Structure formats: structure tokens, C-alpha cells
């Protein structure tokens, strides 16, 4: 139920706050609204590192439950759910359109057409260049890297804070400078 999921979400913030009070470092990855909620909830942010995922909108959990039920999938039996596969963009069935294979799936189609979001996503105050996290991650659709590099998988990484710089310096990722205007123009 929706009330149960709200309790679960609050419990996550309580658990994180407890770890911060114990002096532990915590890396929280979530949607911008979830990061903002955690920052509003937490009083101990010195050891809190945040990463937000550049969001296209969050589909309704109830719609996902309906979709899985329609596909005869028992949500209690799921060990994981992958929305993104490089080979098929996470879509499940194949049809034909204009002479080339076209992947069709109503759940993903609704997501890509922005018609299945939770209500607050339609007026999201975090859908801007002003970010709430130390680092923002998203698709790098506007990358100027070669097609060969793109096949390896690339992401847009935006660093907003000293904590973000600290995380990136400790990471083992290859970073390239990007034109922020171009990068943002290709995101949703």
C-alpha cells in the first residue's frame, strides 16, 4: 500500500540519520526530490555525501504494480527489476516500423511520453540546472565522444560541491570536460 511505502521511505531517512550520528560517512543516491527530503530531515550533514540522478520523472508505483500484475509477475518474487539495458533500452517486445525493428512496451512508452509520472513530477522544482546534490548523474546523450567511446557507456557527471570533488578524486572513473549547455540541451 501507499501508506506502507511512505513508512518505508521515512525509515530510510531515520536509518541514515542514525549512521550520521554515529560518525559514519554515508553516500545517498536518489532522485533530486529524495535528496532534498533527506537534507531537510538530517541535522548531521558533515559526513553526508549526496548524488542525484537527473530525472525524467518518476512513474507511479501503482502503475508499475498494475503492469507487473498484467504480465503475471509476482512482485514478492522479484529479486530485481532492470529498467535500462544497453541492448534494448529496457523494452521487452519487438515490432516493425519503417522497415527496422522497433521496440514497443506500453509501460516504457508511457514513461517516455511523460504520461505516467507521480503527480508532483509534473511541476518538479528540481528540474533545473540548479542541483541539490554534491554530484548529479545522468545520460550523456549530447556527448561529443566517438561512437566507439559511446558504446562503452558514458554518463553525464555534474559536480556542484567540494564534497563532490572529493568523491570524484577518489573514484576510478575517466572524466572528460563537456560543454554544459550542449549536455543539458540533450537531457529531458
Where are these regions (language model features)?
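Generic beta-sheet signal
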Residues: 24-30, 48
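Short, charged, surface-exposed secondary-structure boundary motifs
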Residues: 58-67
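Short, small-residue-biased leader/transition segments that mark boundaries at the very start
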Residues: 1-8
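Gly/Ser/Thr-rich loops at beta-strand to alpha-helix junctions
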Residues: 28-38, 57-59
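Short glycine-/acidic-enriched loop or helix-start segments at secondary-structure transitions
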Residues: 37-40, 168-169
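Long, compositionally biased charged/polar accessory segments in the mid-to-C-terminal portions
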Residues: 76-186
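A short, well-structured juxtamembrane/interface segment
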Residues: 9-19
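A short alpha->loop->secondary-structure connector
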Residues: 43-53
Amino acid at each position: 500500500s501507499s501508506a506502507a511505502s511512505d513508512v518505508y521511505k521515512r525509515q530510510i531517512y531515520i536509518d541514515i540519520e542514525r549512521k550520521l550520528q554515529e560518525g559514519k560517512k554515508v553516500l545517498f543516491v536518489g532522485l533530486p526530490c529524495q535528496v532534498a527530503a533527506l537534507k531537510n530531515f538530517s541535522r548531521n550533514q558533515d559526513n553526508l555525501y549526496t548524488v542525484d540522478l537527473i530525472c525524467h520523472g518518476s512513474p507511479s508505483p501503482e502503475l508499475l504494480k498494475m503492469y507487473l500484475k498484467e504480465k503475471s509477475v509476482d512482485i514478492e518474487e522479484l529479486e530485481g527489476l532492470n529498467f535500462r539495458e544497453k541492448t534494448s533500452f529496457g523494452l521487452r517486445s519487438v515490432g516493425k516500423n519503417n522497415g527496422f525493428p522497433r521496440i514497443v512496451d506500453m509501460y516504457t512508452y508511457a514513461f517516455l511520453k511523460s504520461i505516467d509520472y507521480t503527480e508532483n513530477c509534473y511541476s518538479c522544482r528540481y528540474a533545473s540546472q540548479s542541483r541539490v546534490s554534491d554530484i548529479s548523474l545522468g545520460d550523456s546523450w549530447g556527448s561529443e565522444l566517438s561512437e566507439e567511446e559511446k558504446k562503452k557507456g558514458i554518463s553525464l557527471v555534474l559536480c556542484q560541491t567540494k564534497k563532490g570533488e572529493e568523491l570524484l578524486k577518489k573514484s576510478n572513473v575517466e572524466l572528460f570536460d563537456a560543454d554544459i549547455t550542449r549536455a543539458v540541451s540533450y537531457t529531458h
